[in-house]
């Protein structure tokens, strides 16, 4: 399925866009939405974790940071501002939220499920809109408040950029390993390189090393145009009554278990091979986007549950395949 995520909102607005403003004045957006965001190079991003949800897979609790956070990106154009985003919601919230989005001038470009046998069932709506930043923020606030889909906070997020090391290289010398009260990530980081710990989640971001645009508008990595992986440790060991494979019967010692979710950005020519590698490593593809971008790109939304080291090894092979088009 080919989907235009960006071009539909810039028709008649021109394909040029403004450079990063010296003073974007995003404070008004934060005030309207009741939550701090993060200024980006040429725009602004604000997140709303669904902390009101208790999502589980086979009884295992999952963190909002793993895959259940609504994210919105504001990008100034020559005239007005482009807003793109992802709204995380429950099945039963979809009708009301969709109606609110349309009533407030947003377009829903796509809807897909998490599809990991999670309870309750989760969906993601991809949206776009245009207008002034203040009007967009006010419209978005009406949508989020109607469900309600947001919690206000005064905590200011830290600006951090975490990039995956090359899948063919060992972690750089001198890099600090991620540590967390929930346990270390040494096994995963030995394979994928140092990551950033956000609570119980280990985050990796890997921008595509080529400019990506649609209808003349460059889409930066911070607007979601990158590979993103999040790992979360889960309680229990293989062989218990939570649906894991019974390694004890095979004489193998218990392994550390993790849930993983994220998105892979790649060229269409690599998609089939990557999907085969994912399937071989018990990672599901929840949804596939075929973008009408230049160059043509595909986004695979993925999720898996299993031994953390095996998952990391599988994603290392996937990253090797993806990076063939970046050399």
Regions found by a protein language model. Give the residues of each.
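Intrinsic, low-complexity N-terminal interaction/targeting segments
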Residues: 57-76, 108-113, 208-237
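Bacterial N-terminal signal peptides
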Residues: 6-16
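Intrinsic disorder/low-complexity detector
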Residues: 23-57, 63, 145-214, 245-248, ...
């Amino acid at each position: 399925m080919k989907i235009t995520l960006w071009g539909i909102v810039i028709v008649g607005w021109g394909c040029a866009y403004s450079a990063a403003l010296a003073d974007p004045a995003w404070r008004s957006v934060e005030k309207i939405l009741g939550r701090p965001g993060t200024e980006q190079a040429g725009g602004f991003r604000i997140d709303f974790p669904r902390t009101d949800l208790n999502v589980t897979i086979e009884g295992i609790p999952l963190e909002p940071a793993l895959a259940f956070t609504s994210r919105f990106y504001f990008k100034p154009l020559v005239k007005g501002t482009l807003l793109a985003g992802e709204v995380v919601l429950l099945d039963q919230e979809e009708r009301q939220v969709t109606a609110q989005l349309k009533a407030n001038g947003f377009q829903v470009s796509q809807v897909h499920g998490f599809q990991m046998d999670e309870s309750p069932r989760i969906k993601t709506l991809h949206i776009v809109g245009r207008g002034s930043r203040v009007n967009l923020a006010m419209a978005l606030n009406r949508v989020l408040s109607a469900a309600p889909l947001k919690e206000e906070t005064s905590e200011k997020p830290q600006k951090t950029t975490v990039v995956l090391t090359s899948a063919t290289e060992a972690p750089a010398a001198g890099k600090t390993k991620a540590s967390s009260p929930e346990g270390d990530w040494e096994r995963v980081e030995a394979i994928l390189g140092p990551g950033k710990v956000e609570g119980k989640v280990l985050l990796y971001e890997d921008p595509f090393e080529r400019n990506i645009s649609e209808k003349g508008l460059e889409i930066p990595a911070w607007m979601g145009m990158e590979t993103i992986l999040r790992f979360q440790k889960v309680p229990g060991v293989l062989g218990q009554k939570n649906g894991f494979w019974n390694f004890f019967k095979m004489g193998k010692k218990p392994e550390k278990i993790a849930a993983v979710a994220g998105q892979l950005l790649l060229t269409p020519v690599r998609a089939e091979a990557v999907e085969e590698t994912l399937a071989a490593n018990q990672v599901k593809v929840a949804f596939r986007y075929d973008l009408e971008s230049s160059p043509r790109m595909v986004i695979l939304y993925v999720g898996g549950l299993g031994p953390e080291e095996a998952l990391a090894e599988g994603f290392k092979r996937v990253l090797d395949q993806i990076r063939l088009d970046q050399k």
